[in-house]
């Protein structure tokens, strides 16, 4: 290192050794690497790296926010049913219904016939009917009570509608009707079937659990089939048939009942999601549960609730829309919900899809129930006409006004039901909206594509 490498003032004061003055030292110093300034582009790389890192952090925060943030709860007042909560202090009906179900004696496992009860052998009918005498008495007592307090909070304590013995109860009433008819007690047979449709109406009004509405539709279907079978060969006077026709008509399901019930079912799902935080009365919590559904990754409670809001709004529209009873809206919607994958609320979508599967078929099932009801009312009027006039009417319109105030319309086509005097049958176009001349089945009206009832009167009766 030479003296020239130091500042002048430093070089002057610094002592110089003899070694540094030698020629070898001076030669070595010239070979040392000299300090050079760094290129300017290395500083720009640092800024670029910092910018990319900041963008990465920002993207991570945004994605995390998408997965963790839940939207605020939206408005749902339009879904609230109009039915007010029953304020009666204490009711006993849920307890009585539970006790009644406990008295039902089903067939031994695997021995229940698969055919309708009117096709059973008489000993089988007799054993089943007489073996459930206590249950039938208890059911009559229940039906004699004019008010089941369907809107009372006590119904929320337990899901009685999901009890498997309801199906046995419905078949039991069919068996009672078939057994009495076989004994020649026609009026008793009709009353057993009317009791079944009356039971269906009672269950239809209980909205605490969705299972009650499904049971109501099941009971209504079996009651209609039983009555259609009885009306084939009845000899009951016209005045008595008129009374049964009126009682049956009062128990028919309606669009308005389903619209209101869907609102109650939405509140049921809301309470399952939020528990007491739903804002609903504590004594109406399903099963008395007070727990809120725990939060977890990919499950956003409020976003999931909004899915239920959208779904129930569409179902209510479908229940009231013309030709919506085929259920096409619900099917398309179910497919669109299943197609949502790999999203922040994937678990919530899957939960909503699974829960809604029990509701999507209700408008279509109601459409079939209304079609069966319209066919039965028309068949009642037809049989009354035959009893009095000893002939079939030339058209359904000719049943007005004595036997029908208005000719029932087909709920699927919004047009009159089809009637063929030569074949002696009346039918609905059914879920496929196509008429193919009727499709008699056993049991009656079991073909969803063309529910049909038979008048069972030969062509010679029309001459």
Briefly describe each language-model feature range.
Residues 2-463:
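Short acidic linear motifs
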């Amino acid at each position: 290192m030479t003296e020239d490498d130091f500042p002048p003032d430093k070089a002057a004061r610094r002592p110089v050794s003899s070694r540094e003055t030698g020629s070898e030292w001076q030669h070595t110093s010239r070979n040392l690497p000299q300090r050079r300034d760094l290129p300017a582009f290395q500083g720009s790389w640092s800024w670029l790296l910092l910018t990319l890192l900041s963008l990465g952090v920002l993207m991570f925060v945004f994605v995390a926010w998408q997965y963790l943030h839940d939207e605020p709860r939206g408005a749902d007042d339009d879904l609230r049913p109009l039915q007010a909560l029953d304020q009666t202090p204490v009711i006993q009906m849920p307890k009585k219904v539970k006790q009644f179900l406990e008295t039902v004696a089903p067939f031994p496992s695997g021995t229940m016939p698969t055919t309708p009860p009117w096709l059973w052998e008489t000993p089988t009918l007799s054993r089943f009917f007489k073996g459930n005498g206590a249950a039938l008495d208890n059911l009559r007592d229940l039906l004699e009570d004019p008010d089941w307090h369907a809107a009372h909070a006590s119904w929320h304590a337990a899901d009685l509608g999901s009890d498997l013995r309801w199906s046995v109860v419905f078949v039991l009433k069919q068996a009672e009707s078939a057994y009495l008819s076989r004994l020649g007690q026609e009026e008793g047979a009709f009353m057993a079937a009317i009791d079944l449709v009356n039971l269906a109406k009672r269950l239809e009004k209980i909205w605490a659990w969705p299972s009650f509405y499904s049971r109501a539709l099941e009971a209504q279907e079996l009651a209609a089939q039983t009555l259609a079978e009885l009306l084939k060969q009845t000899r009951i006077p016209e005045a008595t048939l008129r009374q049964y026709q009126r009682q049956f008509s009062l128990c028919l399901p309606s669009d308005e009942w389903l619209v209101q019930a869907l609102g109650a079912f939405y509140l049921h799902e809301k309470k399952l999601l939020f528990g007491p935080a739903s804002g609903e009365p504590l004594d109406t919590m399903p099963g008395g549960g007070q727990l809120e559904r725990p939060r977890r990754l990919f499950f956003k409670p409020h976003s999931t609730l909004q899915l239920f809001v959208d779904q129930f709004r569409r179902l209510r529209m479908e229940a009231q829309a013309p030709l919506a009873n085929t259920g096409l809206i619900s099917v398309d919607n179910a497919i669109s919900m299943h197609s949502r994958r790999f999203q922040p609320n994937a678990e919530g979508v899957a939960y909503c899809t699974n829960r809604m599967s029990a509701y999507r078929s209700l408008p279509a099932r109601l459409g079939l129930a209304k079609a069966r009801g319209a066919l039965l009312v028309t068949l009642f009027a037809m049989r009354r006409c035959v009893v009095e006039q000893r002939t079939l009417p030339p058209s359904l319109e000719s049943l007005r006004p004595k036997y029908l105030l208005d000719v029932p319309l087909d709920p699927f086509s919004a047009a009159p039901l089809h009637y063929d005097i030569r074949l002696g049958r009346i039918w609905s176009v059914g879920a496929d909206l196509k008429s193919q001349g009727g499709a008699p089945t056993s049991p009656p009206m079991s073909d969803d594509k063309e529910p049909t009832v038979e008048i069972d009167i030969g062509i010679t009766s029309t001459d």
